[in-house]
Amino acid sequence: MFKRALCLIAFTACVAMLISPMNAGGDKKGKGKDDPKYNNPTFVPTADEVIEKMFEMGKVGKNDLIFDLGCGDNRICFMAAKKFGSRGVGIETNPVRIREAMDMFDKYNKNDAISYGTEVKLPLVETRHGDALAMKDLGDATVVVMYMFPEFMTYWQPIAAKHLKPGTRILSHDYEWDYSALPNAWKPAATATVKSSSRDNHKVIMWVVPEKNK
């Protein structure tokens, strides 16, 4: 009886570890929660009111290609495709979120959706299972959106500076990179505070990539 109790406790502990928030955003390359670049474990959807403010600030339109880093269910790209006809690429490490992105096809009534493996594609929207720090086509983006912690953003900013085209708009929900660690990092072009049904003080920050010699 005592051995059975110990086994039950051990099994319960293992299940708790698997479903805990700290494991919800595990990176497929094995980088764990101790790596600050990947310490963005919990998915919190961006409120629709915040997304609309991002679209407004970034002047998103039909000719834009939006990259959403840590896209979750990829709702931002789907909303932009439906509202503006713009293209979108979402990238996400968590396969659970990838499955939720597949479910988004039904919500947006896309009958021509194609799904295969860990990727899902539409004519306008693509969802990738991968590493947001290793996107080889980042330079194709005209708009980049994210809801990531400052540690990730601080690591990503020099990558963005190397690859993004001048004029690309970067829009972040709540967080900014660490300016003390990046003295030459771009400063915000605009900020706004947004109220939603869950919070009164969402922050939206926008940067615009300058010419390379500035």
Predicted regions and their residues:
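N-terminal export/membrane-targeting signals
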Residues: 1-25
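S-adenosyl-L-methionine
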Residues: 5, 22-64, 98-140
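Conserved class I S-adenosyl-L-methionine
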Residues: 63-72
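Glycine-rich SAM-binding Motif I of class I
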Residues: 74-78
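Conserved SAM-binding motif I beta-strand of class I
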Residues: 87-92
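A short SAM/SAH-binding and catalytic strip from SAM-dependent methyltransferases
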Residues: 138-155
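C-terminal substrate-binding/active-site "lid" region of AdoMet-derived donor-dependent transferases
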Residues: 151-214
